Regions:
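Charged/polar positions within long, soluble alpha-helices
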Residues: 20, 61-72, 98-115, 164, ...
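Short, contiguous, well-structured surface segments enriched in hydrophobic/aromatic residues
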Residues: 43-77
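Short, mixed-charge amphipathic alpha-helical segments
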Residues: 76-118
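Extended intrinsically disordered or low-complexity regions, especially N/C-terminal cytosolic tails and loops
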Residues: 1-55, 87-91, 98, 115-175
Length: 175
C-alpha cells in the first residue's frame, strides 16, 4: 500500500484544525448574535466531520480492494488480521466499519450490532430510547453516531493501524 495511511493522518489533522478554527469564529459571533446562519454553520461543521469519516473509510475500502485484489476489501482485511491473531485490531476496525455504515445508512443491521455492544465501543451511539447526545446542543446534527474530533481521529488511527498490519503481512509473504 502506498502512503494513504500517512496522508489520512495529515488530512485529518488539517481538516480538524480548520474546522476548529471555523467553529471558534462562529462561537465568537454567537456571543453577540443568535442568528440562524450561525447555528447552521455550527451544524455544518459537525456534518463535515461525519462526511470526512465516511469518505476516509470509503477511500480505504477502494484501496484495499485494489491492493488485496478482492471484491470486499474490509472482509479480506479482517480475515488477514484474524489469521495473524490481531483480533483486537480486527474487532476495533469492524466497530468503526459498522459505525460508518450507520452514518451512511441509518438504522439497520449495523446499528443493531453496535447497540448490542454500546457499552464497550470507543465512541457513542444513540440508543433506541435516546433522541440526542447532548440535549440543548444547537450544533448537533441527526446522526446515530456521535462524530466528534476524537471519532474522526480514531477513524484515521484505525485505518493507519490496519494498513501497517497489512503491510507487515505482505512484507513477510504471509498472504
Amino acid at each position: 500500500m502506498h502512503s494513504f495511511d500517512e496522508l489520512i493522518q495529515r488530512s485529518t489533522a488539517f481538516s480538524l484544525q480548520a474546522l476548529e478554527k471555523a467553529q471558534g469564529e462562529v462561537l465568537d459571533a454567537l456571543q453577540t448574535s443568535s442568528a440562524t446562519p450561525l447555528v447552521k454553520a455550527l451544524q455544518m461543521i459537525q456534518l463535515q466531520k461525519a462526511i470526512s469519516a465516511v469518505g476516509m473509510f470509503s477511500m480505504f475500502d477502494a484501496m484495499l480492494r485494489d491492493d488485496l485484489a478482492c471484491s470486499d476489501g474490509f472482509r479480506r482485511a479482517g480475515e488477514l488480521l484474524e489469521e495473524r491473531n490481531n483480533v483486537e485490531l480486527k474487532d476495533r476496525f469492524m466497530s468503526f466499519q459498522l459505525a460508518i455504515n450507520v452514518l451512511k445508512h441509518g438504522r439497520g443491521r449495523s446499528y443493531d450490532t453496535l447497540v448490542q455492544k454500546a457499552g464497550g465501543l470507543p465512541f457513542r451511539i444513540t440508543l433506541t430510547d435516546e433522541a440526542f447526545f447532548a440535549e440543548g446542543d444547537v450544533s448537533e446534527v441527526a446522526t446515530l453516531i456521535e462524530v466528534d474530533d476524537e471519532f474522526v481521529r480514531n477513524c484515521a488511527n484505525v485505518i493507519t493501524e490496519v494498513a501497517m498490519a497489512l503491510r507487515n503481512v505482505a512484507a513477510n509473504g504471509l498472504e
